[in-house]
Design a protein with these regions (language model features):
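Helix-start/capping segments and mature chain N-termini
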Residues: 1-83, 106-286
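Ordered, amphipathic secondary-structure segments that act as subunit-interaction surfaces
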Residues: 81, 87-100
Length: 286
């Protein structure tokens, strides 16, 4: 038996071996990017921040005019996620991707609003968040600004700005890179939300700037409130604000907090970001 025949995914509630074909070339996610997804961290066989993930998914589906009624309930989806992790014998933490896409044929205008859903699970090989000893080296990518739209806060299949930014980071030998919106403001990185610290105040772009409405972004803001550290949501950052910051860090639900050590000619340290990760770990009992 090949390795992929021992691993499974869930497609519309059915366990399917990983290597099996799932759909035809007329699939709307493939043809038109007519899909939305959530990336979820599993710890101790349970999805972290599940309520927030589900809330964002349902809101995004509503914006895209997908039929929420055709999706299983929150509890049924959660059980499908945890069952898949167990079936794939993942004993460390896992990365789960839950993708929802519109069914049916048609060209740009769909013939129906009902959805199909797909769950994939990969072993992260570690347990719990680990604050990194080494900081990131980052750059800024300006060739493909992210356009502000009703779907900007959500993770959709139309991810070309992030793909191109990821290529830019690889070509320039940096760990991550920041992207800008159509107004030229720095709003996030290609896979994370952005925070920076100046004079012990935390700044982060507001959702209306075009950044992803990140689940871990929300966790950081709540952790800062518990630590009584002020958070200011702003329209985004300029290059000067990035250079002038005391601390920069990036967040996503898979990696947690990653601190930035170098941006252009500046060097940074990690202080508040380390306190925030510790507070989040304690709050979610990791």
């Amino acid at each position: 038996m090949k390795w992929y025949e021992r691993q499974f995914l869930v497609y519309d509630g059915v366990l399917i071996p990983l290597g099996r074909a799932l759909f035809n070339a007329d699939n709307r996610a493939f043809r038109y990017g007519d899909a939305i997804f959530e990336t979820i961290r599993i710890s101790k066989a349970e999805p972290l921040f599940w309520d927030w993930h589900y809330q964002r998914l349902i809101l995004g589906m509503s914006v895209l005019k997908m039929s929420v009624a055709s999706l299983p309930s929150k509890q049924q989806l959660r059980e499908s996620v945890t069952d898949l992790v167990v079936k794939n014998r993942i004993f460390a933490d896992a990365r789960v991707r839950l993708t929802v896409f519109r069914k049916g044929e048609g060209f740009y205008a769909p013939r129906q609003m009902q959805v199909s859903w797909l769950i994939e699970a990969d072993n992260l090989g570690s347990t719990g968040y680990s604050f990194p000893d080494k900081g990131l080296k980052i750059e800024v990518y300006t060739d493909f600004p992210k356009q502000l739209s009703p779907v900007s806060p959500f993770k959709t299949a139309g991810s070309l700005p992030y793909v191109m930014a990821g290529i830019f980071a690889k070509e320039n030998a940096v760990d991550d890179c920041l992207i800008v919106n159509s107004a030229g403001k720095i709003i996030e990185s290609y896979n994370s939300n952005l925070f920076w610290v100046k004079d012990e105040i935390i700044y982060t772009p507001i959702i209306a700037s075009g950044c992803i409405d990140g689940v871990f972004r929300k966790a950081v803001i709540e952790a800062a409130a518990r630590l009584k550290v002020k958070v200011v949501e702003c329209s985004g950052a300029s290059l000067e604000e990035m250079r002038d910051a005391d601390e920069i860090f990036l967040t996503n639900v898979i990696s947690g907090i990653r601190w930035v050590a170098a941006f252009k000619d500046r060097r940074y340290y990690a202080s508040i970001s380390k306190r925030l990760q510790r507070e989040i770990d304690e709050f979610i009992n990791l």
